[in-house]
Amino acid sequence: MRDHFELRDGDLAGRIGRLSVPRAGVTVETPALLPVVNPNIDTISPARLESEFGAEILITNSYIIKTNDHLREEALDVGLHEMLDFDGAIMTDSGSFQLAEYGEIDTTTEEILQFQRDIGTDIATPVDIPTPPDVAREQAEADLEITRQALADAEAADTGEMLVNAPVQGSTYPDLREEAGRHADATDLDVFPVGAVVPMMNAYRYDDMVDAVAAAKRGLGVDAPVHLFGAGHPMMLALAVALGCDLFDSAAYALYARDGRYLTVRGTEHLEDLDYLPCTCPICTEYSPDDLREKGSKRQEQLLAEHNLHVTFAELRRIKQAIRDGDLMELVEERARSHPAMLDGYRALLAHVDQLEREDPASKGAFFYASNESAHRPEVARHHARMDRLTAEGHVLLTEGGVPSGDDFDATWRVVPPFGPFPRSLSETYPLTAEVPERLDRDAYEQAARGVSRLVEENPDAAFTLAHDDWPESALARVPESVELESLSAVSERLGDEASVGGDDGDDGGSASSAE
């Protein structure tokens, strides 16, 4: 186990952790945002990032510092912390971003790691190759080999107390991402950035981003702190945390502000289009859109950048509380409704339900069924997987609430879509206490039918009758042929007809009583 990263709480694959950074003498609570600081541009000073926004860690570019005579001399003379006036942890990039943008840089892993150590970096980065999406597999494999060599060079370097990143690349090839994650995890390096996802996010390919991160996570150990390089828009943070990412960096707060763009948890707005500011941060409570538009360009940029940071840090606090409360999935689902591409990302997340289920706590807060995607949550998959723990004997009635006929049954179990069947003794256990709407969708019934099928498969000697409340044909088609089907509404109509014919003479056909 890595002794510098401690997991304190979790929900889905998301976690609250403590990252110890020995060279800085600080411990950073994760999930954490690393504001990007350009040493040439002072949009918001690092001292203010720390004192006003609560930043515990930031990231800057050691290659920019190294290639600027003035910055290099100052950093070597007084150290990075004094130069930036920041007491928290400082991560530095190696120039890999410049390599991706311009095709080459004038440094090596050995040189840049030594320079990062000399200027007082707390978490350093080797020179990896950020392979963009959709390249030929041969290029992705060749780039990955160069990155592997960079990790080997980083392992061999004398880094002292400085933590070192082990980037995970692999383009849009899940098997290469997983392989890269496994290789990085086997090194003695410390933090694991998933790289080259910015082009996916810029193109709103959140589903591809999810697949890349999920593949990398399969290769990495649970105790590996994961950094999603270049991610920092508040709209996608809950999704990324649910995947198991712990650290985020982005210059978006400043770059977007420079273009008059205003970040929200639902997307990006242009200041020129706003009549109201839908936020309660200090900037939005003091200024109106007209006030901001009347400011000079530099002042407007600074105020927008401050808002953008406030909303991003607030979202991380909201995510942490959701993890603590056990309702991170509800927050992810809410954010998924902000943009069709985010919904694609959410559905991609649910496609990795078996992977999520392995890390998701077995018991937590209330389960709210909010959409057809809720039918595919880890809790449903876990209930189906655990059908092998349930023993059914004799003739078992599986019912949504009523007794279908006068038949005698050896046992009566409840059926609740999307989970399916379970003994009534489990009715008050999580997640079977789920809040489910009266009008369910097809996915919920089809998942319940899968649960019935699993129970029948695990108990071949038992006989089953399913009393359903008008399930759709697509769901009933998934129920094994050996299960007798009865519609509760049809039985209710039949009993009503019999009661009408019999008048006051009584009803010998039974009644639809509660299964609870």
From Swiss-Prot:
What segment(s) does the record annotate as region Disordered?
Answer: 488-516
Q: Name one GO cellular component term.
A: cytoplasm
Name the pathway.
Answer: tRNA modification; archaeosine-tRNA biosynthesis
Cofactor binding note from Swiss-Prot or TrEMBL: Binds 1 zinc ion per subunit.
Q: Which UniProt keywords apply?
A: Glycosyltransferase, Metal-binding, Transferase, tRNA processing, Zinc
Provide the GO biological process annotations.
Answer: tRNA wobble guanine modification
Per the record, what are the reactions this protein catalyses? guanosine(15) in tRNA + 7-cyano-7-deazaguanine = 7-cyano-7-carbaguanosine(15) in tRNA + guanine
Instruction: Identify the domain of life.
Output: Archaea
Active-site residues, Swiss-Prot/TrEMBL: 93 (nucleophile)
Instruction: Drop me one GO molecular function for this one.
Output: pentosyltransferase activity
The record's statement on gene disruption is:
Mutants lack the archaeosine modification, but do not show any growth defects.
Q: Which cofactor does it need?
A: Zn(2+)
Q: Which Pfam families match?
A: TGT
Q: Where is the composition biased (Low complexity)?
A: 488-502
Give the binding site residues for Zn(2+): 279, 281, 284
Binding-site positions, substrate: 128, 196
Q: Which HAMAP family match?
A: TgtA_arch (MF_01634)
By sequence similarity, the record places it as follows: Belongs to the archaeosine tRNA-ribosyltransferase family.
What role does it play? Exchanges the guanine residue with 7-cyano-7-deazaguanine (preQ0) at position 15 in the dihydrouridine loop (D-loop) of archaeal tRNAs.
Which protein is depicted?
Answer: tRNA-guanine(15) transglycosylase
Q: What is the lineage of its organism?
A: Archaea, Methanobacteriati, Methanobacteriota, Stenosarchaea group, Halobacteria
Which gene is annotated as encoding this protein in its UniProt record? tgtA
